[in-house]
């Protein structure tokens, strides 16, 4: 619900801005939860191998990212060579790693600026 509200009304934004909104909104959500709760969430996933094996394809955030990347592909601004699905999976794998690092550091640094630095590099996936 949080992500749906954060992304509402931004479907017409250009794909790079949509992707940044998805990632920054998710970072704000994760930070608001706090590192301890996020650590418990990941521990639960690790303790439930069936749950930890893959992303739920019906998850709103994943669908929003796929829609954004499909739009970028249709506009010819997504770099060729990788599928939209692989690219979305890459972003989630990377972001999960950033969140895990944040948890390992017990939330000692703000998550959003770290992600913003990474996104500046990732913008190169768009040919704009």
List PLM regions with ranges.
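Hydrophobic alpha-helical connector segments
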Residues: 4-33, 84-91
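Short, structured helix-loop boundary elements
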Residues: 12-16, 20, 51, 55, ...
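Phosphate/oxyanion-binding loops and surfaces in catalytic or ligand/nucleic-acid-binding neighborhoods
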Residues: 25-33, 94-101, 125-128
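Amphipathic alpha-helical packing segments from all-alpha helical-bundle domains
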Residues: 28-33, 49-75, 85-89, 93
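C-terminal alpha-helix
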Residues: 68, 121-128
């Amino acid at each position: 619900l949080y992500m749906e509200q954060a992304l509402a009304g931004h479907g017409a934004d250009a794909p790079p801005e949509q992707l940044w909104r998805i990632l920054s909104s998710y970072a704000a959500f994760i930070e608001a939860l706090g590192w301890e709760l996020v650590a418990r969430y990941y521990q639960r996933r690790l303790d439930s191998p069936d749950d930890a094996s893959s992303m739920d394809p019906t998850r709103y955030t994943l669908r929003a990212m796929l829609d954004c990347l499909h739009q970028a592909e249709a506009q010819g601004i997504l770099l060729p060579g990788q599928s939209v699905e692989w690219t979305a999976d890459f972003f989630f794998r990377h972001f999960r790693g950033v969140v895990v690092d944040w948890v390992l550091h017990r939330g000692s640094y703000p998550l959003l600026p770290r992600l913003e630095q990474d996104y500046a590099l990732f913008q190169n996936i768009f040919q704009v």
